[in-house]
Amino acid sequence: MKIQVSRNGICGTDLHEYYDGPIFIPADGPHPITGRQKPLVMGHEFSGTVVEAGPGVTEVQVGDRVAVEPIYRCGKCRPCVSGNYNLCRDIGFHGLMADGAMAEYTVVPQSQVHRLPDSVPLEMGALVEPMSVAYHAAKLSGISDQRTALIYGAGPIGIGIWFALRGMGVTEIAVVEPSAGRRASIEALGAETLDPGAVDVPEVIAERTSGLGADAAFDAAGVAPEQLYRWCTPARPENCVPDCGE
């Protein structure tokens, strides 16, 4: 179906592709599902309005406001048939293996489209994809209410994880962020922050938890593996959830 793009976010992956790519964009041959290769239009965090629908489209109709799940899957491999299409052996991504939403219009399969409720504006619809990443990370941690969590990075994914944990009932959340501007933004939402340039984060968390460590830690900053190891030291090792975003 053809979608008129309303809003499209710029993901960290887009920046890496632009400055250092091709990384995920097929360079040596067409993608096995989409048949596309470079050059491609990027953009996968978006919302829009359906303006054309093919004859086999039944779930949405022209005029519907939608958010798009950007995953292409074959539907035939073992992960796909078992319901784990995010592990498809030929997985593709809209805006990386097919022309994306940094354009006025883009075309996607029906299986990737989700109708927005009337209460959700298109501006918020563009946040569905990145916020689903944040929510998934929060759920993967297994953390429950009345627990302690650390989030490294107060960018969009870090903020999303903070919201998700709050919604799950987690009461003690510290956000580690070196940027004063980003600290101010998430503090305005009610978050507690730690400046790693001013305090020793593992030491602070150890003091707060009687040496036990946080119940979960999330990397929403995108850093080197050796730094991840250090960041996980203030968390209980079984509940460190690294590499959630950038």
Per-range role (PLM):
Residues 2-8, 23-78, 117-119:
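Glycine-rich beta-strand-centered segment in the early N-terminal region that forms part
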Residues 16-23:
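Short Gly/aromatic-enriched secondary-structure transition segments
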Residues 21, 178-179, 246:
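Residues in the short beta-alpha loop(s) of Rossmann-like NAD(P)-binding domains
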Residues 30-44, 72-152, 183:
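NAD(P)H dinucleotide-binding glycine-rich loop of Rossmann-like/cofactor-binding domains
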Residues 59-62, 145, 236-237:
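Short, flexible surface segments
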Residues 66, 149, 213-217:
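Receiver (REC) domain switch-region micro-motif
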Residues 120-199, 203:
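Mid-domain Rossmann-like dinucleotide-binding core that forms the NAD(H)/NADP(H) cofactor-binding site
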Residues 141, 184, 189-246:
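Glycine-rich cofactor phosphate-binding loops and adjacent beta1-alpha1 units
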